[in-house]
Amino acid sequence: MPVMRMLKIRFIDSIIERIAERVSNRVADLLEQRALFFSETKKLFDQPETDSGAIVCAGGQLIHQRNEIECMSYAKVIGELPPPQHPPEVPRRRSELCKQADFSLDAYRYWSSALRLPLTLHRKHWEFFYICQALHERGFLSTGRTGLAFGVGREPLPALFASLGCAIVATDQVSDDASRDGWQITGQHADSVAALEKPNICAPPTFRERVSFEAVDMNSIPVHLAGRFDFCWSACCLEHLGSLGHGLRFIENSLNTLKIGGVAVHTTEFNLLSNAATLETPGLSIYRRCDIEGLVRQLEEMGHHVEPLNLNPGATLIDGYIDLPPYHEEPHLRLRIAEYDCTSIGLIITRGT
């Protein structure tokens, strides 16, 4: 090959390499910005907004008037019934999606009252109800039981469980990481046991006796927590661990903290629109049916028991509404994240031998 032609080819190759490098760097920058955006947006999901905005029906109909949205409050849809005095008997919880039907249960009113939460059609309140009910009906919310909370934030659950006689180790990420990721500025991070006190739920002396705090990385659970607890839980945390795989590995690893026969209850984001395409960024991932079903198969092959999946999304009016930013106090059972409609899913897993 002539020398001049070889030089031209090398020159062209060098230009192509430079262009490819610039494109690669630009794509990386865009992915980082996209991940940051969705991570910051997700931090607002559990802090209901009261600003006027729009709710979109699954069929595509927009409702712009705030007074129309207010017509779908808990009181208007379910009623204003008082909470029962004792935990009612209800069908045993399965691994399932958040649905309107659960908000009409006496058990939802009971646990909302116990947690000092207002009755509202909000999926975060459903997650708390789901965790409480799942643990209660399996006999874990009683004196002498031990529980471990992951990514606890400012949840009222440790205070409630302590008031019922449980000893709780509450964990959250280290303060520097929480500050970097934006959880402190939104008031969704705990760095001490004092941050979790709820005097209207549990008397302070009892709380301080039964609740302790540790900083824990959910991607690297310390060995000293292994095999110590009757139950563990997390409420919409594992989707923030870095990827779909990181969250699934956390669920598997969380079982190592349990005694044999102990129960883990975890909630996370579920993709209602697609079993193929989904959102996966360092700050936020949305789980598909295939991800959940694959996890169930894996855990059961390892000898654990997963409560049967019920992925019926419900068929009521509220089940069909998708909340758009700025998000509302209610109804907020389904919401739009990027191009995906999603809701909360709860998983109940018993550690096997």
Where are these predicted regions, by residue range?
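Membrane-proximal basic amphipathic "stem/tether" segments
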Residues: 1-74
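Conserved alpha-helix/loop element of class I SAM-dependent methyltransferases that forms part
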Residues: 125-144
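Class I SAM-dependent methyltransferase SAM/SAH-binding core
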Residues: 148, 155-221
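A C-terminal cap/extension of S-adenosyl-L-methionine-dependent methyltransferases
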Residues: 213, 308-353
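A short acidic, Gly/Pro-enriched loop at the edge of an enzyme's catalytic core
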Residues: 219-232
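A short glycine-rich, Lys/Arg-flanked "PGG" loop and its adjoining helix->strand segment in the class I
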Residues: 245-262
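Conserved beta-strand signature within the Rossmann-like core of class I S-adenosyl-L-methionine
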Residues: 261-269
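Conserved Class I S-adenosyl-L-methionine
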Residues: 275-311
